[in-house]
Amino acid sequence: MNMRIISLRKEYLSLLPSMIASLFSANGAAAVIDSCQGYDIKANCQASRQSLSGNMQDWSIADGQWLIFSGMANNASGGAVFLQHSAEFTISPQNETGMTLFADNSVSGEYNNGGAIFAKENSTINLANVIFDSNVAGGYGGAIYSAGTNDTGAADLRVTNAVFHNNIANDGKGGAIYTINNDVYLSDDAFNNNQAYTSTSYSDGDGGAIDVTDNNSDSKHPSGYTIVNNTAFTNNTAEGYGGAIYTNSATAPYLIDISVDDSYSQNGGVLVDENNSAAGYGDGPSTAAGGFMYLGLSEVTFDIADGKTLVIGNTENDGAVDSIAGTGLITKTGSGDLVLNADNNDFTGEMQIENGEVTLGRSNSLMNVGDTHCQDDPQDCYGLTIGSIDQYQNQAELNVGSTQQTFVHALTGFQNGTLNIDAGGNVTVNQGSFAGIIEGAGQLTIAQN
């Protein structure tokens, strides 16, 4: 990734005032900037609202120049861009440093969605080197709303090298992005301080940063699939569920792949997601609401490359902040490390560590893993699984360090699984078996077999 883009993502808040000052007049208007003429942008310019129906629009931004969509207020969906009937909308740099800014766009009314961009009927959005700042939707998708039909092919929404900051869904879902029945690709992005607010009827308000869901009632129809790669979530909030991410589906599980790949080099290869919270319609952060993520009928894979680390949460925060909750399935793949520092006791789905390491940084923080499945089928009850028969060539490890951990349901370790308990640490399980390696000076207690 170009170093200028890295700088914009890491230092966006400090760069914003001087950046805006250089682009706008003292009154905040874009009067000093010429209107865009065509889609091949050679100089800073202000675009008008775009409306596409079944056709294509491709913007190309020259190095060092800005395409600006700002200050557009509408009482219909799509503050700056409206797409329908399989329209295709693309913004990309000609080389590396051309940038696009969507700022202070809004749509009013609880049924109007997409503060900056609205897309329906299988329209596609492809964006690179983009900043979304302070866009507001009266309904869903503070910055982007995208609805499709889960057709096979390329992603319906593709956003790379982007910053989403301070976007708001006022009476809906997806503070920054709301997508339904779509395939989504997000890479090298940053989501900071986005919010999803609820209505007075205490509905919606899910997905402080992103809400990715599927409501197709046909079980034979494929569910949606989202890839979130090398992307940071910080300070996002939801009055409902899923402070950073909310995901659910009506029939087949929605699929999400959260990855840190070999190319990620910031912070020594350590990506940190923290200070995300969800209230669950209450007065403060709730573990049951999923401060980081809430999984309904969904399957989430954390794929962390060798030598890379994804850290979710901070042990110095309240345990509800950056928590994971819900009933879906979590799978850890890739030989890198996943560190969970929040209180995840309201995650009751199953967890499988197939490769690499999962570290629990907070005591008694994953107690109820597997509860949903075990309640449904007590005779075939699985909670947390370390290692795999099918992936025998991999090495999987659960590291509890010196924490105290209790697992209400089965803890199962295969031959390629390792349980590390440091001195002072303790793991207690009500049932289970471990055919792999147990290391460290801590203690493992299995109440029954």
Which residue ranges define each predicted feature?
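Gram-negative bacterial Sec-dependent N-terminal signal peptides
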Residues: M1-A29
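N-terminal segments that cap or nucleate solenoid repeat domains
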Residues: A30-N105, S298-L310, E316-N317, S323-I324, ...
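Right-handed parallel beta-helix
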Residues: D34-S35, A62-G71, E88-S106, T124-V136, ...
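Glycine-rich beta-solenoid repeat tracts in large extracellular/virion proteins
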Residues: S48-D58, G79-Q84, G115-K120, G142-T149, ...
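Small-residue (G/S/T/A) turn/hinge positions that recur once per unit in extracellular repeat modules
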Residues: Q57, Q65-L67, S86-A87, S123, ...
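Extracellular beta-helix/beta-solenoid repeat scaffolds
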Residues: W59, Q65-G71, A87-F89, G98-D104, ...
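Extracellular beta-strand solenoid repeats
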Residues: S60, I68, F82, T90, ...
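Surface-exposed loop/turn positions within long extracellular repeat scaffolds
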Residues: N75, V107-S108, V136-G138, D151, ...
